[in-house]
């Protein structure tokens, strides 16, 4: 499922985006800032799918042609910006996938939406290139920059975007999600919640990880011997 209802926590972000949809006051540029695996891309996907939904509500219907395309990552007016180099988004990436493409009107939808994950990897030249588009975007364009380090982006980019900051999800919400949605046993859910620290993606990854038992045993061992360990040993263990 991919609706706002399926987003765990992040009530302020959900409210902001759904209010914008309801009022038809969509910004041309958004930044979603939060740590890795916190759910930034899922929120961006839901928002994009809702904007393009043919039924025009504040939730994607998941039944229309556009929603079905979006669910299979084949919606032509929702573009996921990629980069060949693992640690760098280059100026060529920006020019080829955004700047040279954005002037082409949407194929079949009201908006043309660009979603860029790991936006902090943009080089200074890439940031300056996208800045030119942010300064004078077409009326149908929506650019979503997802980042784990908002401070890596130019102040001039920040000033032209709506910045939405992810917050840690309450432990109880994470626990309920693991136990009721993923059928994770309660003892395992408790350990995952403790390690995830409000990061729903991290909790989900831990719960499904083959390394879970190793992590649990290491944690129990640390607790057992912590009184006999010096600070450097504790730091190394963590």
Stretch-by-stretch model annotation:
Residues 99, 132-135, 179:
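A broadly conserved amphipathic alpha-helix scaffold signal in soluble, globular proteins
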Residues 118, 145-150:
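A short beta-strand-to-loop transition that corresponds to the Sensor-1 phosphate-sensing loop
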Residues 2-125:
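Clamp-loader machinery-focused feature within the broader ASCE/P-loop NTPase space
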Residues 128-145:
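Conserved catalytic/switch belt of AAA+ P-loop NTPases
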Residues 57-58, 144, 210:
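Short, polar/charged, Gly/Pro-enriched helix-capping and turn/loop motifs at alpha-helix termini
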Residues 1-49, 69, 139-140, 149-238:
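Charged, glycine-rich active-site and insertion segments that engage polyanionic ligands
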């Amino acid at each position: 499922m991919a609706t706002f209802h399926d987003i765990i926590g992040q009530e302020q972000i959900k409210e902001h985006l759904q209010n914008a949809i309801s009022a038809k006051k969509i910004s041309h540029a958004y930044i979603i800032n939060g740590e890795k695996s916190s759910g930034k891309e899922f929120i961006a996907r839901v928002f994009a799918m809702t904007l393009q939904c043919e039924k025009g509500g504040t939730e994607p219907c998941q039944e229309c042609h556009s929603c079905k395309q979006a669910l299979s990552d084949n919606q032509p007016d929702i573009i996921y910006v990629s980069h060949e180099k693992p640690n760098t988004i280059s100026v060529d990436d920006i020019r080829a996938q955004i700047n040279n493409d954005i002037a082409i009107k949407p194929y079949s939808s009201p908006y043309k939406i660009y979603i860029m994950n790991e936006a902090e990897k943009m080089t200074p030249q890439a940031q300056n290139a996208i800045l030119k588009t942010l300064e004078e975007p077409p009326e149908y364009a929506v650019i979503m920059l997802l980042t784990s380090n908002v401070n890596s982006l130019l102040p001039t980019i920040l000033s032209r975007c709506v910045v939405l900051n992810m917050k840690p999800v309450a432990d109880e919400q994470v626990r309920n999600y693991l136990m009721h949605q993923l059928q994770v046993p309660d003892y395992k859910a408790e350990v995952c919640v403790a390690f995830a620290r409000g990061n729903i993606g991290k909790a989900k990854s831990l719960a499904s990880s083959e390394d879970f038992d190793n992590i649990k045993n290491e944690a129990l061992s640390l607790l057992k011997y912590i009184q006999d360990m010096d600070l450097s040993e504790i730091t190394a263990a963590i």
